[in-house]
């Protein structure tokens, strides 16, 4: 139901805070949940909508109605499932009536939490598995409940006729149960389950609120009127959000239809979806808090917060991954067709420039810095914390010092004054000081010029600026938190007054600011967060995605919600002064620093009204729209007046400052355990283990006996092999094909898993989880698709002579391939195990095989050939990228596919391989930044040259070695 996802694609326009983002970020178009409108191109002249199943089947999507109309409208036909839902709802109401007063609240709290769990956990689990494995459709396919009993293949004919009657009663036009695709019928049945859960969820919540409702003692009439008026207003607003959302998304997205099939229509971005991100999950829960107000119960408020948090978890864990997979796939890679084209592209400076060749390295070139450096080592986030970096170390030390002083000093008026003054000074520096530096950088590039004057590069100036801004931001908020700590007093009586409400609202505002900051960072990236367009004059390009789709300057209000949350929690006038100062200075920063630069950089392309403002303006009467324009004009004229005063006073202030400095100079010189359950099938009679076998095939590395000079005398002789079998040594990441044999009556749920040899002590039973590294031997017998990826051939009948008397008999054989996530991305010795009937009984074990990354041998670190490195590195990277033609390069200069930037697992595989091959350790961000094999090879060669003096290997430049014979 609650599809908290906006509809449509990005809209171009203009806004103040949306700074330019890097080119890579521009590729990541953040598309909210697509929905359809009646005006879309996917309808024919008769107004019919067409759907498309995953196998390409096109069908007419009949018109359906929302669940409230279906259940409660007398004009809508009723079926058995409607009566079941209405009966259960009536049972809830009857239960509230018969329960004693003392039992109503706990009983309905449990009932509501049960239905909420069914919603977020139950439906979430079903949708997650449907998205990844088509589980619901596979259940319907395996059970054959939608197959006509006349064919004799439906084991449940009565259930078939019941479902057919139930669905056809509801959908009278453009629908035939027999002809509708399996996916659509499955979705219709899933809808009935959703109707039951969602109606019971909301009904039990309302009944719980009724059970908890009370009239506070000594509450004035005015407060009662305000409380009920506000509550009713929130409920009505919630109702409008739901109705407008359903108008836009229809039943298709309301019931998660895109988990089952897609609509052949254009995407839209309309109505409430212009107002807020994920409106069904954000503002769509305003009614819960309105009901809490009317009930005047903290119990209702807290259970509303729990429900709201669970809904956001549902969004993050279920819906967002499905949306990214369905509507935001990585764009196709631009391929290099010929060597001539590759040379042409290199000469035209592509987005990721290729590293220089050996002959080019020593030629001095004038480097241009119009584009920002690639983001390799970001600053923000705990996952980017690096104690080797002075910015991070300084930030941690100053915060530790600040909070230590806060905790160890008493909260006397004198110390309170010092901490408040410290917070005010840091806020002034963060807004006025940083604003002045950015203004000078915008007008005359003063920050960059300073570093260029001392021989540094603009990239160094950019890095130093990021450190300065980051430390200033950290100290601004650390000092504010310290001041709030000093001014806060724990309530002596939590039940008196509005103490609990103040803390709940304050915590909510703080959470809102944190979410806003995270959303801004996700939209702008590291480059935009640190005002990169003040430093690099790349071609101006605005994007309006994420939170900027709805607001031009989210930090103007939402970005400072947390400071006002601190005011509510402390109930302190001093903290209110700090919050007011912070808000005024932030507004001034936007008006006098950001806005002039944005207008200069982007001009008329700036958007005047964001999505929220447009929605509000459309809902206002003409007289109020005119008043809004007049107010905007007054504010603009006021800002212009203040700017004129500052421009006039600037020379006088400068002269006064110079005099003050001159006089002053004269006076002063101067940082789980998992439980595995092995399932055993006791009935193994009738299966001949000699018919089971596993044979491993893959491209092999040349055998290397190793360096025997360290061994004893007897161990230095070459291995004496008695037989034709040799060691199996496979390259890192290469797909491994497994040929299996089994009796003809083998279970169709048999499966093959990949394990480290040392992980299992038993040869009869596997007691270690496969962790997803397994493939079924037959298709269609498991409720997910992942286990079937890799099946090549199944149940081919062949003859064999194995047996006691050597007689030939038939067995089944097949082939599967393990690749990608089904492999161990490390070195070691592994084996495959054939398991029986979906359990962990081992029927056959393959020969052990070794996965090895060959060490790159170079004669001299200083003469290391980049071409040789490229040649050795290319096949390894192709394996690391699953040999996927959409992302794996075919030549050293070909760019990686965009999925490498999104999914960090590919870069992690590469850096592990590079570390083992060359002894050089890189961060995964380096692989993504380099963008192709040639750049990475150049970086490896350069790193080897830099680290050669510190090498302790036998061939190290500073290590004396014996002369080679």
From Swiss-Prot:
**Catalytic activity reported:** a 1,2-diacyl-sn-glycero-3-phosphoethanolamine + S-adenosyl-L-methionine = a 1,2-diacyl-sn-glycero-3-phospho-N-methylethanolamine + S-adenosyl-L-homocysteine + H(+)
Q: Where is this region: Disordered?
A: 34-54, 326-368
A single GO BP: phosphatidylcholine biosynthetic process
EC id: 2.1.1.17
Pfam families xrefs: PEMT
> Transmembrane segments in this chain: where?
83-103, 107-127, 193-213, 221-241, 275-295, 298-318, 395-415, 417-437, 471-491, 504-524, 560-580
What pathway is it annotated to?
Answer: Phospholipid metabolism; phosphatidylcholine biosynthesis
Q: Which residues lie on this side of the membrane: Lumenal?
A: 1-82, 128-192, 242-274, 319-394, 438-470, 525-559
What membrane topology does the annotation report for this chain? Multi-pass membrane protein
An example GO CC term for this entry is: endoplasmic reticulum membrane
Superkingdom classification of source: Eukaryota
Q: What does the record list as coiled-coil region(s)? A: none
EC class (word): transferase
Renumbered to this chain, the Polar residues biased-composition regions fall at 344-368
Topological domain (Cytoplasmic) residues are 104-106, 214-220, 296-297, 416, 492-503, 581-965
For molecular function, the Gene Ontology terms on record are: phosphatidylethanolamine N-methyltransferase activity
Which keywords does this Swiss-Prot/TrEMBL entry list?
Answer: Endoplasmic reticulum, Lipid biosynthesis, Lipid metabolism, Membrane, Methyltransferase, Phospholipid biosynthesis, Phospholipid metabolism, S-adenosyl-L-methionine, Transferase, Transmembrane, Transmembrane helix
What are the subcellular locations of this protein? Endoplasmic reticulum membrane
Say what the protein does. Catalyzes the first step of the methylation pathway of phosphatidylcholine biosynthesis, the SAM-dependent methylation of phosphatidylethanolamine (PE) to phosphatidylmonomethylethanolamine (PMME).
State the family it belongs to.
Answer: Belongs to the class VI-like SAM-binding methyltransferase superfamily. CHO2 family.
PANTHER family xrefs: PHOSPHATIDYLETHANOLAMINE N-METHYLTRANSFERASE (PTHR32138:SF0)
Q: What is this protein called?
A: Phosphatidylethanolamine N-methyltransferase
Q: What is the lineage of its organism?
A: Eukaryota, Fungi, Dikarya, Ascomycota, Pezizomycotina
């Amino acid at each position: 139901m609650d599809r908290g996802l906006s509809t449509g694609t990005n809209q171009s326009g203009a806004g103040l805070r949306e700074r330019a983002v890097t080119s890579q970020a521009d590729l990541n178009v953040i598309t909210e949940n697509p929905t359809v409108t009646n005006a879309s191109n996917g309808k024919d002249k008769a107004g019919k909508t067409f759907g498309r199943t995953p196998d390409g089947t096109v069908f007419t999507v009949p018109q359906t109605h929302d669940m409230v109309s279906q259940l409660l409208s007398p004009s809508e036909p009723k079926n058995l499932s409607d009566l079941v839902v209405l009966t259960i709802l009536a049972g809830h109401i009857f239960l509230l009536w018969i329960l004693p007063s003392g039992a109503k609240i706990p009983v309905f709290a449990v009932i509501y939490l049960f239905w909420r769990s069914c919603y977020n956990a139950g439906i979430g689990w079903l949708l997650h598995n449907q998205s990844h494995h088509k589980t619901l459709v596979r259940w319907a396919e395996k059970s054959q409940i939608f197959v006509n009993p006349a064919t004799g293949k439906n084991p449940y004919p009565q259930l078939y006729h019941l479902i057919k009657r139930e669905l056809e009663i509801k959908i009278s036009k453009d629908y035939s149960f027999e002809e509708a695709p399996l996916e659509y019928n499955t979705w219709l049945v899933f809808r009935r389950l959703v109707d039951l859960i969602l109606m019971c969820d909301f009904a039990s919540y309302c009944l719980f609120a009724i059970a908890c409702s009370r009239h506070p003692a000594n509450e004035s009439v005015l407060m009662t009127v305000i409380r009920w008026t506000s509550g009713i207003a929130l409920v009505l607003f919630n109702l409008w959000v739901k109705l407008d959302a359903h108008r836009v998304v229809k039943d298709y997205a309301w019931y998660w239809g895109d988990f089952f099939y897609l609509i052949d229509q254009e995407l839209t971005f309309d109505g409430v979806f212009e107002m807020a991100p994920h409106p069904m999950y954000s503002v769509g829960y305003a009614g819960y808090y309105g009901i809490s107000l009317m009930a005047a119960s903290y119990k209702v408020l807290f259970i509303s917060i729990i429900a709201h948090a669970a809904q956001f978890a549902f969004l993050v864990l279920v819906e967002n991954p499905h949306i990214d997979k369905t509507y935001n796939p990585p764009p196709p890679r631009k391929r290099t067709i010929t060597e001539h084209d590759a040379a042409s592209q290199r000469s035209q400076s592509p987005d990721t420039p290729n590293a220089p060749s050996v002959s080019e390295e020593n030629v001095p070139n004038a480097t241009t810095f119009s584009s920002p450096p690639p983001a390799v080592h970001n600053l923000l986030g705990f996952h980017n914390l690096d104690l080797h970096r002075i910015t991070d170390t300084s930030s941690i030390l100053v915060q530790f010092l600040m909070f230590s002083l806060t905790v160890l000093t008493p909260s006397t008026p004198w110390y309170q004054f010092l901490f408040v003054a410290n917070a005010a000074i840091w806020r002034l520096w963060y807004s006025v000081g940083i604003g002045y530096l950015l203004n000078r950088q915008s007008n005359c590039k003063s920050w960059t010029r300073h570093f260029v004057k001392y021989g540094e590069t603009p990239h160094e100036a950019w890095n130093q600026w990021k450190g300065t801004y980051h430390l200033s931001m950290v100290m601004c908020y650390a000092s504010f938190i310290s001041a709030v700590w000093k001014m806060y007093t724990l309530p002596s009586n939590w039940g008196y007054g509005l103490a609990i409400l103040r803390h709940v609202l304050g915590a909510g505002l703080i959470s809102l600011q944190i979410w806003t900051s995270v959303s801004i960072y996700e939209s702008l990236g590291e480059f935009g967060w640190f005002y990169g367009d003040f430093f690099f004059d790349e071609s101006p390009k605005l994007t309006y995605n994420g939170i900027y789709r709805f607001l031009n300057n989210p930090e103007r209000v939402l970005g400072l919600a947390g400071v006002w949350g601190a005011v509510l929690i402390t109930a302190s006038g001093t903290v209110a002064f700090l919050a007011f100062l912070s808000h005024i200075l932030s507004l001034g920063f936007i008006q006098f620093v950001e806005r002039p630069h944005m207008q200069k950089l982007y001009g008329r392309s700036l958007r005047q009204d964001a999505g929220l403002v447009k929605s509000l303006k459309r809902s206002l009467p003409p007289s109020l729209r005119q008043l809004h324009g007049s107010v905007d004009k007054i504010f603009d004229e006021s800002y212009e007046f203040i700017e004129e005063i500052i421009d006039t006073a600037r020379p006088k202030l400068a002269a006064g400052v110079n005099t003050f400095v001159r006089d002053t100079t004269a006076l002063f010189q101067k940082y789980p355990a998992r439980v595995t359950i092995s399932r055993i099938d006791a009935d193994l009679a009738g299966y001949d283990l000699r018919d089971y076998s596993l044979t491993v095939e893959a491209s092999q590395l040349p055998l290397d006996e190793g360096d025997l000079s360290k061994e004893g005398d007897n161990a230095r002789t070459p291995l004496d092999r008695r037989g034709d079998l040799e060691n199996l040594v496979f390259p890192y990441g290469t797909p491994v094909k497994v040929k299996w044999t089994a009796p003809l009556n083998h279970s169709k749920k048999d499966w093959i898993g990949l394990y480290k040899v040392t992980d299992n002590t038993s040869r009869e039973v596997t007691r270690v989880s496969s962790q997803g590294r397994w493939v079924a031997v037959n298709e269609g017998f498991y409720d997910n698709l992942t286990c079937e990826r890799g099946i090549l051939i199944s149940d081919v009948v062949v003859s064999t002579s194995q047996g006691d008397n050597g007689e030939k008999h038939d067995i089944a054989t097949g082939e599967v391939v393990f690749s990608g996530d089904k492999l161990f991305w490390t070195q070691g010795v592994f084996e495959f195990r054939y398991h029986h009937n979906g359990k962990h009984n081992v029927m056959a074990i393959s020969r052990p095989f070794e996965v090895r990354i060959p060490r790159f041998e170079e004669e001299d670190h200083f003469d290391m050939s980049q071409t040789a490195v490229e040649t050795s590195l290319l096949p390894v990277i192709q394996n690391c990228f699953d040999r996927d033609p959409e992302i794996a390069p075919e030549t050293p200069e070909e760019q990686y596919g965009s999925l490498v930037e999104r999914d960090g697992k590919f870069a992690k595989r590469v850096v592990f391989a590079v570390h083992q091959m060359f002894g050089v350790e890189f961060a995964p961000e380096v692989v993504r930044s380099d963008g192709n094999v040639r750049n990475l090879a150049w970086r490896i060669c350069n790193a080897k040259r830099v680290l050669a003096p510190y090498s302790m290997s036998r061939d190290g430049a500073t290590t004396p070695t014996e002369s080679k014979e």
